[in-house]
Amino acid sequence: MTRRNNGHSARFLVASASWFSHHSGMIREPSRDRPGRSPAVAPSFQHERALLKRGVWPVAGCDEVGRGPLAGPVVAAAVVLDPKRIPKGIDDSKRLTAARREELFEEITATASFAVAFASTARIDRDNILRASLWALARAVHALPDMPRHVFVDGRDRIEIACACEPVIGGDGIVLSIAAASIVAKVTRDRLMCKLAQDCPGYGFETHKGYGVPAHLEALGRLGPSPHHRSFFAPVVAARERHRAPPIGESASATETSAGISIEATI
């Protein structure tokens, strides 16, 4: 799906194929790798600007959210910020309140080119969480309206894309376009989990977003797995065995796809 926002294009995709990771050199954030680190510094546009000065553009940032939860998809986002219209206050999504993330989401999607891709629970079960996440990241990059010439991706893994890829450990706290992608991915996934909560009430997806908090574990043990749970994550395996339920399989994909399309229409 492609949408226009103030002259910029946005695309949303549902992930449906596996991808492999590659390891290579990367930017590293010293403050996150050593004890006694200094206070967090806000991400900057200096890495993108350095490439722009060399004539390398578009430059995208890419991040994902949802590797750790017991339920719901992984959501990846790729963002190309407009150097002349960068929203103020962009930061690692984890440092922001939910309300501030929502505000910045609207500003980013109104001024930047971006794309979002979903890796369903069925894909996660089939390919494993790492491969599904890397596939969604690559899918988001390839879905951008214009293929970037350089991509900064959060983490240590390269992704299979048709342009230069630079992993950045702790990138959502260093590279501004990665931070923007982290906000887009987080808000998109949170909204999706609220939709899935309507489809499967009782688990509290709207509050914990699928993460393994005590209330979620209690509901999982009491109700058994829903079609949105990841079959091979340990607490889900235990609940499935307790309820003698088969692996969830492909049934989650259609529901997530439907919910994703609904969310795309409202964002």
Curated annotation (Swiss-Prot):
Protein name: Ribonuclease HII
RNase H type-2 domain: residues covered: 57-245
Entry annotated with the keyword Transcription regulation: no
Record-listed E.C. numbers: 3.1.26.4
A molecular-function term among this protein's GO annotations: manganese ion binding
Keywords assigned by UniProt, alphabetized: Cytoplasm, Endonuclease, Hydrolase, Manganese, Metal-binding, Nuclease
GO biological process, one term: mismatch repair
Family: Belongs to the RNase HII family.
Name of the encoding gene: rnhB
Subcellular locations according to the entry: Cytoplasm
Residues at which a divalent metal cation binds: D63, E64, D154
Entry note: cofactor: Manganese or magnesium. Binds 1 divalent metal ion per monomer in the absence of substrate. May bind a second metal ion after substrate binding.
A cellular component annotation (GO) from this entry: cytoplasm
